[in-house]
Amino acid sequence: MAAATATAGTAACSSSSSSRGGSTDAAATSGVQPPPPPPATAPPEPLRKPRMDPRRRQAALSFLTNISLDGRPPLQDHEWGGGEEGGGTKPGARARLSLLAAGCNAFSAPGTAAAPWTAGSGSSPCPLPPSLVPRVLGEPSQPPRSAPAVTGAQLQLPDGPGGAGQEELEEDDAFTNVQVPSASFLGSGTPGSTSGSRGRLNSFTQGILPIAFSRQNSQNYCALEQSGQGGSTSALEQLQRSRRRLISQRSSLETLEDIEENAPLRRCRTLSGSPRPKNFKKIHFIKNMRQHDTKNGRDLKLDGGRQSAGAMSLKEIIGLEGVELGADGKTVSYTQFLLPTNAFGNRRNTIDSTASFSQFRSLSHRSLSMGRAGSTQGSLDAGSDLGDFMDYDPNLLDDPQWPCGKHKRVLTFPSYMTTVIDYVKPSDLKKDMNETFKEKFPHIKLTLSKIRSLKREMRKLAQEDCGFEEPTVAMAFVYFEKLALRGKLNKQNRKLCAGACVLLAAKVGSDLRKHEVKHLIDKLEEKFRLNRRELIAFEFPVLVALEFALHLPEHEVMPHYRRLIQSS
């Protein structure tokens, strides 16, 4: 009994964990409780770091594998030589596996703790299957077989026609089923953890290299596997140098490629896990900057199937003659419509300030028009026609002498002169008035009777339907008559111009709210039988044709305002 007790005490001193069961059995057999081992001699148990959830680790590895460091999408199997069959090797997977072997060799360097790697099995650190070496070196590989466990995960290299589905999954991402120990991710200060993270970054960089670089890099890393068993520091330095050299070569080749192809940008989705588009092509970013206004301020995709009024194409209706909008990628400058800032600061605050400013504006516009007429753009195509040189007269189109024509009889008396018109059929009088107007203004494409009829419709819509005041209607008349006298109106766009003038006058002359603007657009669409999109798109061409002069002087608005007050 004493011998058994002495034997149990000796076993407790020699081993703290493995022989404890034997001493307990001996003590139980003898019936004597052995003394507890001294706490000073027992070695402390190694601290267990919190184990990462395998699902979170798998998700993190999958995310890090699918992203790329230079913005390119992850490469698929068919782009890395998908035509090879059977024992053919994939350069992308081959390079990734060689990098995995290099990272594992760095972990197995002398002086590093290999206990976390060999805890689950008695194999060497980071074991690789025998089929890895022939696959890396480009030799025919053998049928798939399972490899020793790496912390509970298996690295399988399926090859051949038998494992088609698994081969597609494995070769698409060589790191999907490889789980690195949690010590390398949770901040262990050993050199093995640093080398493992660096090897993983090298694998990500290698995965996006061209095919030629992948083959060359795999050979270099295989040579490092054979010669890097002595020390991990030299192997890591060589890995870093090789990676920097390959990145610089890749960037230089991409620069040359971009120069040769007029610097196109690769526009594709870079979402994590999203497949690369099959019809992948390079699109220049300037060609992709066309927004909605593609053809003369309109979107033909939205309105291509709709037939417009007057059996005219949409391209002919939208846009005013002589108005450049910068369609089809052209750049148009409107700086000639601007006035100098000091024109507003040098005016005196007197009663005739409005008249002096209006005279200055008319003189500036006259000199501007004459300057444009003397330039190389003084042609009808550029908009410098007869109407651009005329000063606007608010009484011109409302002159009561227009309907007289050849049917009038002038009576001269000593103190006054009067005109008498005999009875004439209204149709003949209208025809005579339009002919006289056409002779005097040949550049205006609409007749005088049609212009006056449109003005009556504008007034009825603005005052009766929308409740606008007379100054707003007078401003709309000025805008519309300026377009008519400059020859911008025709039979196809006359209602669009009238609606755009009413809309601009309502925005400038009235404080409209959102629902009021919507109500006005609805009324214009109903009364003038217009399309809402065409009306809104026509607003900017009218603004350009008016030379952005929406704030009108008093002498242009007051005559129309007086006539509206008298007739109401």
Curated annotation (Swiss-Prot):
Ranges where the record places region Disordered: 1-94, 130-169
Tissue-level expression reads: Ubiquitous. Expressed in postnatal day 1 (P1), in postmitotic neurons of the subplate, cortex (V/VI) and marginal zone; in postnatal day 7 (P7), in all layers of the cerebral cortex and in the CA1 and CA2 regions of the hippocampus (at protein level). Highly expressed in brain, kidney, liver and lung.
Alphabetized UniProt keyword annotations:
Cell cycle, Cell division, Cell projection, Cyclin, Cytoplasm, Nucleus, Phosphoprotein
Segments of skewed composition (Low complexity): 1-31
Question: What is known about its processing and modification?
Answer: Phosphorylated on Ser-274 by CCNE1/CDK3. Phosphorylated on serine/threonine residues by CDK5 and on tyrosine residues by ABL1. Also phosphorylated in vitro by CCNA1/CDK2, CCNE1/CDK2, CCNA1/CDK3 and CCNE1/CDK3.
Main subcellular location:
nucleus
Task: Enumerate the residue ranges of region (Interaction with TDRD7).
Answer: 1-98
According to its record, what are the GO cellular component terms?
cytosol; growth cone; nucleoplasm
Extract the InterPro entries matched here: CABLES1/2, Cyclin-like_sf, Cyclin_N
Q: Where is the composition biased (Pro residues)?
A: 33-45
GO terms classed as biological process: cell division; G1/S transition of mitotic cell cycle; nervous system development; regulation of cell cycle
Region annotation (Interaction with CDK3) maps to 140-427
Q: Which residues carry this modification: Phosphoserine?
A: 248, 274
| Subunit structure comment from the entry | Found in a complex with p53/TP53. Found in a number of complexes with CDK2, CDK3, CDK5, ABL1, TDRD7, CDK17, CCNA1, CCNE1 and TP73. Interacts with CDK2, CDK3, CDK5, ABL1 and TDRD7.
Reported function: Cyclin-dependent kinase binding protein. Enhances cyclin-dependent kinase tyrosine phosphorylation by nonreceptor tyrosine kinases, such as that of CDK5 by activated ABL1, which leads to increased CDK5 activity and is critical for neuronal development, and that of CDK2 by WEE1, which leads to decreased CDK2 activity and growth inhibition. Positively affects neuronal outgrowth. Plays a role as a regulator for p53/p73-induced cell death.
In terms of PANTHER family, this protein maps to: CDK5 AND ABL1 ENZYME SUBSTRATE 1
Q: Name the protein family.
A: Belongs to the cyclin family.
Name of the protein this chain belongs to: CDK5 and ABL1 enzyme substrate 1
Give the organism the record lists: Mus musculus
- The encoding gene: Cables1
